[in-house]
Amino acid sequence: MNYQIVNIAECSNYQLEAANILTEAFNDLGNNSWPDMTSATKEVKECIESPNLCFGLLINNSLVGWIGLRPMYKETWELHPLVVRPDYQNKGIGKILLKELENRAREQGIIGIALGTDDEYYRTSLSLITITEDNIFDSIKNIKNINKHPYEFYQKNGYYIVGIIPNANGKNKPDIWMWKSLIKE
């Protein structure tokens, strides 16, 4: 696959395409985080602000996915967002973007990446039960993917679950927190 990695901040057309991808990809899931171009454009503008990292992947001069990284702690930053145009999903675009992001993060001295991956639509076993102090750790350990939740994509790329916020998005709608060390041992 021939592709080009581009800095979204350097081109207003890329920013517009990035906002469109954000709206299209999340609306396809039923997620209203960015229901329109105004909210999506605002999100893209925040993602391209310094010192954040934000870049996209072009195929045939068209943006098909993009990724961002922003400070969370001094040496561990938060991945936000990773989004791929629906017609390019499951074709390796996300993995390419993720590996490029990890390499750029290492070059800047970042030693870990954290991310939150919400389960707002009952796509994991965590959303099927009431999480309590007594069952939280077993529930995380025994998580099952019910309907193509992206946590498995991140696991395949070296991230692991470090915790959850049980009702982050409403009753039985957890935010699953994941992390990966970038230290090469």
Swiss-Prot record:
Keywords: Acyltransferase, Antibiotic resistance, Plasmid, Transferase, Transposable element. Substrate binds at residues 34, 73. Residues 14-183 form the N-acetyltransferase domain. InterPro entries: Acyl_CoA_acyltransferase, GNAT_dom, MshD_Acetyltransferase. Its EC number is 2.3.1.82. One of its GO terms (molecular function) is aminoglycoside 6'-N-acetyltransferase activity. One of its GO terms (biological process) is response to antibiotic. Coiled coil: none annotated. It catalyses: kanamycin B + acetyl-CoA = N(6')-acetylkanamycin B + CoA + H(+). Acetyl-CoA binds at residue 147. Catalyzes the transfer of an acetyl group from acetyl-CoA to the 6'-amino group of aminoglycoside molecules conferring resistance to antibiotics containing the purpurosamine ring including amikacin, kanamycin and tobramycin. Homodimer. This is Aminoglycoside N(6')-acetyltransferase type 1.
